[in-house]
């Protein structure tokens, strides 16, 4: 019983050097070692910390760098989609262009070359019409299917097949070059202040032409229709054309100027056609003013004509009458006529409804002469001995153009003698020269 076991002996009486490594002394000298990697492969199970953790939303907001990269990729995607759509559209259009080119070549083959130019007289139905050419009679022809029927109207210019004369195209109506030349692009420099006297004439033309274009509501309030046109008549040089220039300067309306002799054309029908084109352009550019100078060239009294030229002039005048007072309202188009011989005009041209106001331009009186001399000598360097009252009070019949010619001639005489001032003697010589040429060149009693 007194003997212990071997294990007991070791624990109690063993030597110090016989201690095991797992003793208390080894725990103090041992360093920390990380735990070994888990041998389990798979997702780590998260520990639940109660119902609060299950209800909380996870924080999945991306960082700023990730957001910028996402926007960049979206923009690249948009560009790629645009490129894809563009390529697909080009692929679809390529056969269409080839087909259009093929159709165009077929149309050209059907039209033939060369093509004739004619005029459409009447449309019978959707596929047939009556046409005429400048050198032949009228024909009943067909209209090809590719011709735009909406643009076909009687009187328009068309393209016809060279052999069968069918309608194969339409010529777009453009402005006649002669009418485009008649349009005054730059306003004249003359104004109402440059006109000496003629206060009553200026007032009348303002009421008949200028005021209806600028304030048409005044005529509507009073219940009247403004005049369609006026005629200016009087002796040469009394200011008819000058007043028309002043009207063009004072208003912003389109101004078309034509001389009566320009309406007389060589070929049959060209004169009336030019009149129609003139008023058509004026209607398109309205508000506008049509000024026809020397209207007596085409507006003379009608009589039995024996030549083709005289009959053509009468046709031109009839077309002018139709344009002045036809079924179509002129609207904002005003007409100004000017002539030296109103007694030779046809009464139908001067009746109310066509020309509602007739404005007479008499020779200037003493007050008007003085004003005209002041206007034309305002920029001249005059000597001290010049007395314009002598020329103002003279009994000779001066027109405004004569007074201007006297002032111009006096300045030329001063330049001839190397002088920069115009003397009284220069005016006297200029007056004698101008009046002598006037009496010599005009037959007696022409403008009585």
UniProtKB/Swiss-Prot annotation:
Gly residues bias (residue ranges): 1-16
Coiled-coil spans in chain: none
GO BP field: proteasome-mediated ubiquitin-dependent protein catabolic process
Molecular function terms, GO-annotated: ATP binding; ATP hydrolysis activity; proteasome-activating activity
Residue numbers spanned by region Disordered: 1-56, 93-112
Main localization, broad class: cytoplasm
Gene Ontology CC annotations of this record: cytoplasm; nucleus; proteasome regulatory particle, base subcomplex
Protein name: 26S proteasome regulatory subunit 4 homolog
Organism: Oryza sativa subsp. japonica (Rice)
Gene: TBP2
